[in-house]
């Protein structure tokens, strides 16, 4: 510090070590039993995935597991940490919500009196599967249509003196004596000026997929408060507490003392109604799963159902991942080819991920696989073959699944055990421990043919199991970038440099 006139020289050491760059995980696009529709959602464990997106799907009285589930389970079992999941559906879907003004044990409305609603909730998950309304609870407080995949609400701890209450989110198939509590929000208020206001405490934001006049797909967010519940959000507050009351329930002015009991909800439990959208619409019924997937039936979906989700994930500023897949689509089906090419283009445009694709359906020949692989030329895409057999974690059945459902897990294991620039292949890093067997036991000659066509073989070795035995990209020109580990090295380096350089964008040159 100078007191008399002079020149003060200062130094600022900027040679400090930056924080380690963030590492990103995988992305998967596909159908799930429940969850937000076409809203990319980050999950950090398989149990979290099941809570949000559900497990087995029932079609024709048989439980099936979506390939999305198989991919998620394998990814986390292989050491994956973050999975960006985008649920795809066929047709229009909407959330279920609370509504009704008639008191009763099975009432769907959250009432403050016998004939008036206090506020409304709606489920974050969309589809008719979230509906569980019935006129009255069955024995022991159960809901006939309550299931492991939907939820119910309960109001408790009502304090008419302070104007507070608790909201409990329960699993849809629990009972009055054995409640399965998913979330609890205590000390809630209907006073918009309080920190514990129900919309602030639970959240009221909703994401809707939009397409602007330029054809750009984006998510539009409505609502002022971030959702803190994984299952519900506040749809609207119908009877907010008048702002002239304080937290003690007494008038803050000379206004008439209207009691809190006229506004806050009464104790009780209820259900949700009016969710729309079927996982297996009549247009694609019965749904075709696993090796039975066809040109126009991909687990109850069509290929065009994937288009908007692919477009949305092109935005690298909003969504981060280093590998992306959509198991169930294979390039040999004409109706699937556009979406598979779009996925490859996504990876090329983003330049921060590899698209793992499947070029042939179950039961193909080596020559058919190489023919389909020849239609691609990109260092940002990789193909693996043949299909493999594994236990579906949601249905418990042994199923056939394409290689793309397992490769993100191999990449993740490589990242955890080594580094991204190590080859994600071989007896150790390429081991598919969750796989029972490969569709074909490839000979050395067949592996050579596949590798010459830039298809990575899934090989079987006695005593060693099933392993990924190749690491080529689909680039045709022979160069360093026709190897997966080199492409992943450059992706990692560019990502690290970009994250550090972002802090310097507006600094002086």
Predicted regions and their residues:
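Charged, amphipathic alpha-helical segments
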Residues: 4, 10-12, 55, 68, ...
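Conserved aromatic
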Residues: 43, 182-187
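Structured, hydrophobic secondary-structure cores that serve as assembly/anchoring elements
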Residues: 1-118, 158-166, 170-176, 193-197, ...
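Surface-exposed loop/edge segments in extracytoplasmic proteins
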Residues: 175-183
């Amino acid at each position: 510090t100078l007191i008399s006139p002079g020149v003060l020289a200062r130094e600022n050491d900027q040679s400090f070590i930056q924080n380690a760059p963030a590492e990103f995980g995988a992305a998967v696009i596909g159908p799930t039993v429940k969850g937000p529709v076409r809203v990319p959602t980050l999950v950090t464990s398989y149990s979290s995935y099941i809570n949000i997106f559900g497990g087995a799907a029932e079609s024709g009285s048989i439980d099936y597991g979506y390939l999305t589930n198989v991919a998620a389970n394998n990814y986390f079992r292989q050491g994956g940490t973050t999975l960006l999941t985008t649920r795809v559906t066929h047709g229009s879907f909407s959330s279920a919500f609370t509504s009704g003004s008639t008191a009763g044990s099975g009432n769907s409305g959250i009432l403050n009196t016998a004939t008036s609603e206090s506020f409304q909730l709606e489920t974050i998950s969309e589809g008719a599967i979230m509906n569980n309304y019935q006129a009255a609870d069955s024995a022991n407080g159960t809901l006939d249509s309550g299931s492991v995949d939907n939820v119910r609400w309960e109001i408790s701890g009502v304090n008419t003196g302070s104007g507070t209450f608790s909201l409990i989110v329960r699993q849809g198939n629990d009972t009055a004596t054995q409640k399965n509590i998913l979330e609890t929000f205590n000390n809630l208020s209907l006073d918009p000026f309080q920190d514990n206001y129900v919309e602030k405490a639970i959240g009221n934001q909703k994401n809707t997929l939009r397409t602007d006049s330029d054809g750009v797909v984006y998510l539009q967010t409505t609502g002022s408060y971030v959702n803190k519940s994984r299952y519900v959000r506040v749809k609207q507050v119908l009877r907010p507490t008048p702002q002239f009351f304080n937290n003690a329930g007494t008038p803050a002015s000379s206004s008439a003392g209207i009691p809190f009991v006229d506004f806050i909800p009464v104790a009780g439990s209820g259900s949700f109604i009016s969710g729309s959208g079927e996982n297996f619409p009549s247009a694609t019924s019965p749904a075709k799963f696993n090796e039975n997937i066809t040109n126009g039936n991909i687990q109850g979906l069509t290929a065009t159902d994937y288009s908007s989700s692919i477009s949305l994930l092109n935005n690298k500023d909003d969504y981060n991942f280093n590998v992306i897949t959509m198991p169930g689509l294979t390039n040999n089906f004409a109706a699937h080819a556009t979406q598979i090419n779009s996925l490859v283009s996504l990876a090329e445009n983003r330049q921060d991920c590899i698209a793992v694709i499947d070029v042939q359906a179950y039961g193909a020949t080596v020559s058919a696989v190489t023919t389909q692989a020849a239609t691609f030329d990109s260092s940002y895409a990789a193909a693996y073959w043949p299909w493999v057999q594994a236990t579906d974690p949601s249905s418990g059945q042994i199923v056939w699944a394409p290689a793309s459902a397992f490769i993100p897990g191999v990449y993740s294991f490589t990242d955890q055990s080594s580094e991204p620039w190590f080859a994600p292949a071989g007896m150790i890093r390429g081991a598919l421990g969750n796989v029972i067997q490969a569709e074909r036991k490839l000979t050395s000659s067949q592996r050579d043919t596949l590798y010459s066509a830039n298809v990575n073989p899934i090989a079987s070795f006695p005593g060693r199991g099933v392993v990924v035995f190749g690491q080529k990209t689909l680039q045709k020109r022979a160069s360093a970038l026709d190897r997966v580990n080199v492409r992943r090295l450059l992706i990692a380096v560019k990502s690290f440099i970009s994250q550090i350089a972002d802090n310097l964008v507006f600094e002086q040159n």
